[in-house]
């Protein structure tokens, strides 16, 4: 009966999407504890007049994963203590070896907490996180979790692995989410030091034998670790229950019902694939919407096209209790309220949070600095221009210039560093400016214009003082000055170059870059 109901729901949704020339959809429902497939809808019904690849089994067809793998990276980094749930991650214009990720919204927050980056499915922070974690390790983790479609070595995918640079199947993805849930559930079935059974990580099954579904007398070989720990999984699934999704993942308040669901969407480049996967302690529901032909369509996103179908399927399933918190491998610690990192003695606002045990080893707050100011905190000073007994040692939350530039536009309470008092000569200030493009040490291509003429690179700089004048020099030649919007066209030859920027206060920034060729 469930199979018939889900088939009808899938066909009804596709019928509504047909007006946008979206002709295919697929859905899976499986039991989390056993992996048994309860419903399998490989495609929508064929139209009477024409076929749109309706005979293709989409569930086993490799498709670009979009953002659907981001929860596994978040969990892995929690597991290793590389981040805490609310650790700030950069969200700024980024180019890494020619790879330039963009957020769905096309804008930047400057810095955003890791959990909010996952909830909002921000691409730029995800790339920074993967760079920190290393894509080679993530490639290995995904294979360990059951992703069979990674047929190329890690370098083939690089950092794009987190943004849909690899293909996955709905079958594998559903199995991986189910394995997360199963690991969390079975953690409590094995009291003692060793609580993990590697056999909990397995693909979905069409048929589950009675011994598997009801348990067996055979004692599993237990270990004290797994690809992902129960604590990291628990924290990740809780983050994925967030209902309000700004930006790409918006408008789901009306699904805030009695059922608690951890869910994630994904959208591939070119709007070719819409994914939605949800997991509870009882069920995993995985949905794909798109065209079997690979044709992209406007509005073909995981949020708009796939998630409504997933929630309609969940409406046919029973609810239940949520996953238990694995307190045995978690610690309660204090963190800086602003950076999300372990607090130091100069963090003036702290929160108490539960973290994975290795979170105790994570970096302490790197954003709070002690600066020397006047008593009213309006100006920075130092010992050569202010008597020591009149200098106030002040704790200040300081973002790097590029992050600050974007962060300030969305966080009105952010306090930029106070300027130095005019009588204070600045000899070694905190970094005042930062080059957004080209990045230090980067290697860039400069394309030719459509008319064949030599193209130009547009340099971009941000400064803490919005009204300052900056003077630009390339390889010792003065190029000109900028004020407020620090963008400057340059036309360098192929080879290595030195770019020097000097502001009106004498602060200097020197960066090296290389032009590889003119395309």
Q: How should each PLM-predicted stretch be described?
A:
Residues 1, 25-26, 89-94, 105-149, ...:
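Active-site-adjacent helix/loop patches that line small-molecule binding or acyl-intermediate pockets
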Residues 1-63, 67-68, 80, 84, ...:
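Periplasmic/cell-envelope proteins involved in peptidoglycan metabolism and beta-lactam response
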Residues 25-67, 72-76, 143, 173, ...:
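Active-site beta-strand/loop architecture of penicillin-binding DD-peptidases
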Residues 33, 83-138, 202-235, 241-242:
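Conserved catalytic neighborhood of penicillin-recognizing serine enzymes
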Residues 53-59, 109-112, 119-126, 155-162, ...:
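Flexible glycine/proline-enriched surface loops and loop-helix/loop-strand junctions
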Residues 147-214, 221, 227, 262-270, ...:
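Active-site-proximal helix/loop microenvironment
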């Amino acid at each position: 009966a469930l199979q018939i109901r889900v088939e009808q729901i899938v066909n009804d949704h596709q019928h509504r999407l047909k007006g946008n020339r979206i002709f295919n959809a697929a859905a899976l429902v499986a039991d989390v504890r056993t992996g048994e497939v309860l419903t399998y809808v490989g495609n929508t019904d064929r139209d009477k007049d024409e076929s749109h690849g309706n005979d293709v089994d989409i569930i086993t067809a490799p498709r670009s994963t979009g953002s659907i793998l981001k929860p596994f990276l978040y969990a892995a980094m929690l597991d290793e203590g590389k981040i805490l749930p609310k650790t700030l991650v950069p969200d700024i214009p980024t180019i890494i070896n020619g790879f330039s990720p963009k957020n769905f919204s096309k804008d930047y927050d400057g810095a955003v907490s890791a959990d909010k980056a996952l909830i909002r499915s921000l691409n730029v922070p995800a790339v920074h996180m993967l760079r920190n974690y290393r894509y080679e390790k993530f490639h290995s983790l995904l294979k360990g979790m059951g992703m069979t479609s990674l047929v190329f070595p890690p370098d083939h995918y690089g950092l794009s692995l987190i943004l849909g640079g690899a293909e996955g199947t709905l079958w594998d993805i559903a199995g991986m989410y189910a394995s997360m849930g199963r690991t969390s559930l079975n953690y409590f079935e094995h009291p003692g030091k060793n609580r993990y059974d590697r056999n909990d990580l397995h693909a979905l099954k069409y048929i589950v034998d009675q011994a598997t579904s009801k348990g067996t007398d055979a004692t599993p070989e237990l270990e004290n670790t797994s690809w992902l720990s129960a604590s990291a999984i628990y924290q990740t699934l809780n983050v994925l229950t967030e209902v309000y999704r700004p930006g790409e993942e918006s408008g789901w308040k009306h699904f805030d019902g009695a059922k608690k669901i951890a869910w994630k969407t994904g959208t591939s480049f070119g709007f070719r694939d819409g994914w939605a996967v949800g997991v509870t302690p009882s069920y995993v529901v995985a949905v794909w919407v798109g065209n079997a032909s690979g044709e992209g369509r406007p509005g073909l996103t995981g949020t708009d096209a796939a998630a409504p179908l997933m929630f309609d399927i969940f409406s046919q399933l029973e609810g239940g209790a949520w996953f238990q918190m694995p307190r045995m491998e978690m610690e309660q610690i204090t963190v800086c309220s602003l950076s999300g990192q372990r607090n130091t003695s100069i963090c003036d606002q702290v929160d108490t949070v539960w973290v994975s045990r290795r979170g105790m080893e994570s970096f302490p707050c790197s954003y709070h600095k002690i600066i020397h100011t006047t008593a009213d905190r309006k100006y920075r000073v130092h010992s050569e221009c202010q008597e020591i007994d009149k200098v106030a040692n002040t704790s200040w939350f300081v973002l790097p210039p590029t992050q600050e530039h974007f962060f300030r536009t969305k966080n009105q309470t952010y306090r930029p560093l106070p300027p130095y008092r005019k009588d204070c000569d600045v000899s070694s200030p905190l970094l005042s400016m930062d080059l957004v493009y080209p990045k230090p040490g980067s290697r860039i291509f400069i394309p030719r214009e459509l008319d064949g003429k030599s193209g130009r690179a547009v340099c971009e700089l941000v400064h803490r003082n919005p009204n300052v004048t900056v003077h630009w020099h390339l390889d010792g030649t003065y190029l000109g000055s900028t004020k407020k919007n620090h963008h400057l066209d340059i036309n360098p030859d192929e080879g290595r170059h030195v770019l020097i920027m000097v502001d009106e206060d004498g602060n200097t920034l020197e960066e090296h870059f290389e032009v590889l060729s003119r395309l």
